[in-house]
Amino acid sequence: MLSTMQDVPLLISRILTHGSTVHGTSRVTTWTGEAEPHRRTYAEIGARSAQLAHALRDGLGVRGDERVATLMWNNAEHVEAYYAIPSMGAVLHTLNLRLPAEQLAWIVNHAADRVVIVNGSLIPLLAPLLPKLPTVEHIVVSGPGDRAPLQDATARVHEYEELIAGRPTAYDWPELDERRAAAMCYTSGTTGDPKGVVYSHRSIYLHSMQVNMAESMGLTDQDTSLVVVPQFHVNAWGLPHAALMTGVNMLMPDRFLQPAPLAEMIERERPTHAAAVPTIWQGLLAELTARPRDVSALTQVTIGGSACPPSLMEAFDELGMRVCHAWGMTETSPLGTVARPPAGSIGTDEEFAYRLTQGRFAVGVQARLTGPGGERIPWDGESAGELEVRGPWIAGAYYNGPDAEPLRPADKFSEDGWLKTGDVGTISPDGFLTLTDRAKDVIKSGGEWISSVELENALMSHPDVAEAAVVAVPDEKWGERPLATVVLREGASADFETLRAFLAEEGKIAKWQLPERWTVIATVPKTSVGKFDKKVLRRQYAEGGLDVTRLG
């Protein structure tokens, strides 16, 4: 027996139509660094999204599920792209502007992006890559910035405002299959090449509803959310989609992500909510300590990407900002857990302990812990295992594997289809997750991941280096940073500055990933099967047993 309910597909275009009409007076405010920020209502966002869709279809010839990439900061035009591209049936591909150039080029080519919408200030990042991007036919430039580096581009260059000007402000959005691809993000490639995660209209719609639930972020049209988490970072944790569902106003920082402008926009625009990784909040705390401001409107802060130090959480409590942990990853859209303490703990000593966990699982996320032998680990708050999840907004494969088939590597997906997160932790009987380690030795720095293997391979390509092991060590500012331990070849005398420069120049390692901490060791400790025993190195560092040099 089937129900008598209507079968209406869950589409991003329905979120756009709802937000631009029912919540048409809500606004996206984009910080400009000038006396007055730029303001645009959701009604205007809806009209301009339609114009952009017409421009992409009629002006640039985008058809079907072709990919349109964005290389942009958080701003109103990026929100328009968020809605126009998937609503017309194409696929939004947000590019991580912090990736090394080679990875960016690989990702664009792997996704076969046909159009790139870029902020003018990011042209210096894009222009050198264009000769390596054969699929890109059009470049659309938005906002201030020198266009000169694009003058020799073989792709056609368009101005965003000129491209959409005069086009219809209404679009007959197609009735798509809700399972159709809407957007894609690539993982940061901690093991091998980056991997593409493709989100459906259905998954984004359901995830947005979860973001808005009271036990998640619980935002309404009375709120303004300062969206610091980048729109290229797992769709800004779902906030741009969730906001138009409930009319949440958005304050977008554009490229002004430094502590001083963030403090100024909090004081001037008075957001009630903000979302970012811990390193942003550490910098903001230092700024507010040095130069106090009225930030009393901001009462709720969502932190993800890495754990928030208890001292930072307590410091923001004193400022009246309640920090709330959330956990997720690119493959989980990303919302998996949110750390809102259960009712019985409020006002007790247990409340803060609950807040320090990664949180309780959302209703759409099933979770289990698996031991080394594949055994199921109980939810007892003590027994640790690798976290595996599944649900309607959880990836079941990666995009475009061999023979263009979905890629399901055994280290990422179980035989019965669950996502292996690579995170190790415990789950309490009432469903609160506490992460204790990484299954692999990924370094989480400021909410972004650094591959220890990539650094090791680059180091060991230096002629003076016999072996190299890189491990994560605690860092007050970034959460974790890489420690490079190297074994020099006999007679070699390479200094650390030289090795660091080699990583950047020959190893093509992004500047922010370069280690500051270095040490020479006689040999890399190994396990019984010959693998690097990194826990020994971490213990030696913690106990002060390594002679570490810290570079500036």
What are these regions (language model features)?
Residues 360-364, 372-412, 448-450:
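Conserved ATP/PPi-binding loop(s) of AMP-dependent carboxylate-activating enzymes
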Residues 142, 508-532, 550-552:
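AMP-binding/adenylate-forming catalytic domain of the ANL superfamily
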Residues 99, 105, 116-120, 391, ...:
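AMP-binding/adenylate-forming catalytic core of the ANL superfamily
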Residues 59-63, 167-180, 184-226, 238, ...:
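Conserved adenylate-forming
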